[in-house]
Amino acid sequence: MALLTKSTFLKGHQCHKYIYLDKYYKKEKDPLTEEQRKKYEGGHIVGAMAQHLFRGGLDVSLISKSRDVLVVETKKLIEQGHTILYEATFEFNNVLVMADIIIKDGDEWKIYEIKSSQKISATNRIDAALQYYVINGSGLPIKEFHLSCLNYPRLEVIEMKMEDIPADLFKFEEVTSFCKELLIDTEEKVKDLKTTLALPSIPNIPTGEHCNSPYTCEFIGFCNRPQEEINEGLFS
């Protein structure tokens, strides 16, 4: 089983304490808010719309709930000649990622990461760099890596019917060169986060602005509790 995923990598990029708690103390997470739930649901809807626009693919995630199995199945499907895959799963250096859409172009592949916002953020680019690092490292030849975001407000988009999706629903930004430039930095960050996860105890990092940037941490409630109360909860 992979030690890191795209999700945990981004959490660790935000805060080392965040990734540590997420790995070993999941039960301490704050309850999911209604706003967060709607955002996750909206992301799934937008993802389905992207698959509708890039028709003819096979959704690898439907094959199994085991990510280890999905890595093997992705490799098999590529070897069998499939040219469009959704949620293709790759592992390299004990890091696992799932690519939203991959499309074969000649002997190489174009990767598309779908975002449900109207702007591409710095965090989205870091996300892309990690995916490039893993997919390239796994041996798949990458021709281009694209980030995509919405041309229309998300709340409008998630109310659209599939048959009414406009051809220009998404705008695309190619970030292949950026991802290549960050290969060494990404590998160093992976190494750094693995070191953090090997620590014998929770990193001592105080709360601050980073708790809400770029995303709201899921452990703010835990970190704001008095230290004595935290110790009692962890060791009782």
Language model feature labels by segment:
Residues 18-20, 24-25, 40, 86, ...:
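Sequence-level detector for tyrosine residue identity
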Residues 1-108, 231-236:
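Metal-dependent nuclease catalytic cores that hydrolyze phosphodiester bonds in DNA/RNA
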Residues 67-148, 152-156:
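Well-ordered mid-protein domain cores that form the structural environment of catalytic cofactors
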Residues 16, 21-25, 31-33, 124-126, ...:
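Generic alpha-helix signal with a bias toward terminal, lower-confidence helices
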